[in-house]
Amino acid sequence: MDKVYILVLLLMIIPILICIKYAGKVKSEVASSIVKCLVLMIITILSNGVFVLSDNQLFSYVMEGLYLFSFDVLLIYILQYSQQYTQVFSEVTLFRTGCFVVAGLDGISLLLNVFFHHVFTLKAENYISFQMYHISDKTIFYYLHYGFSYCLMFCIIASFLTKIVQISDFYRKKYVPILGVFCVIVILNIVCNISEFPLDISLLFFVFASILICYLTLYRSPKELIDKTLSIVVAGMNNAVICF
């Protein structure tokens, strides 16, 4: 079971590493944000994966805290990416700094939880003859953590929805798939959180998200978009000739 699970983790991480390689070749702010998102995806996947495999309670506390913290920071960078990609709102440095401060304080709280258990406690249970720790008792600090996370998720979804509403159909192909897979991640994350299942199933869709983000943002322009752009250029040239 352990070997199969480790193999699954590797199969998830390898495509993301390939995306990091290709995104790193593009010199732009949005490409830089994508690389940061992808690196944090790997940290989030590994921390949750190691948490599931761990049979040591203290180490499980550390890994679950790292997973929750890295997910926070990942969402902040996805929000930064969505701002740069959709351009439906201007980047507010004070807001971004505030998000990092809140995430940092949350990270410190999660680290202290290893010793004081003031955010959540862990309990060992058997899942299909396999013992795993899962979050048992939750405090107000745990709900505040997820309240912050879901606020970031809402902002990300809102930015993509706003962009999709504002643009024509042939532009939407660069935004709808990313929004779709992100919504799946959000829904599965909520389901896993409510059910207290140790393994975050939503992480499986990080692979699809990383590929879509890199491909649609950095490497692909829809054929209709290219045709439309060329038609505008040709029309402009014709108008210029007529005026001349």
Residue ranges, per PLM feature:
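Sensory modules in modular signal-transduction proteins
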Residues: 220-244
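Alpha-helical transmembrane segments in multipass membrane proteins, preferentially the mid-helix core
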Residues: 15-21, 77-81, 146-169, 214-220
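Interfacial "cap-and-anchor" motif at the non-cytosolic start of specific transmembrane alpha-helices
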Residues: 2, 24, 167-229
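Hydrophobic transmembrane alpha-helical segments in integral membrane proteins
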Residues: 1-15, 138-150
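Hydrophobic alpha-helical transmembrane segments of multi-pass membrane proteins
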Residues: 4-55, 63-80, 99-116, 178-194
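Hydrophobic transmembrane alpha-helices
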Residues: 43-51, 105-129, 140-198
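Membrane-interface helix-boundary motifs at transmembrane edges
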Residues: 21-34, 57, 83-95, 161-174, ...
